[in-house]
Amino acid sequence: GKPWIADEAKMYLNECVDACEKIIKSGVYTLTDNPAARATQYRDMFTNSKASEIYTNEFIWARTYNAELSVTHIFNSYMVNVQYGNYSFNRDFVNTYLMSDGTPFTTKFANYNSVDFKTECTGRDLRLTQTIRHPGFTRNKNGAKVAFAPDLGFAKTGYHPIKWLSDDATMDTNTSP
């Protein structure tokens, strides 16, 4: 196809805003906020096999995976095996996550592009540590919690995605429900 021209882009943006306002005003959907689960609930929406039952007020569209119905995926393999594409986020994307007090990360440090990784992940919107491997990130492997640091052989930028990654490391080479 041909690229959009500026007027078309603005028209589509306005259509999107109008549609979103209708959804918000309908009252059918609400954002999930369980204060006791804030450290995990965002990622849980993408990894919990029962998410479509738990987060019914937030999901507008969801795909439920079910091994009995042969509706599965191999996403874990794509997120941990180098032969599948080496997905990673870049620093500009990570910088869009605010600090926990709502201020931009980029205004917190004069040298924000050169702070160490641990500092970069500290005091941020909790969704950041539910999106990338971070200091302290663990997964379950054969019944034990195991630390998983960012794998620079996989995520060349150091920002290794985890948002959709199952906590069960034994699923990395299997089809996941």
Predicted features by range, described:
Residues 1-153:
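An aromatic- and glycine-enriched ligand-binding surface/loop that stacks and positions planar moieties
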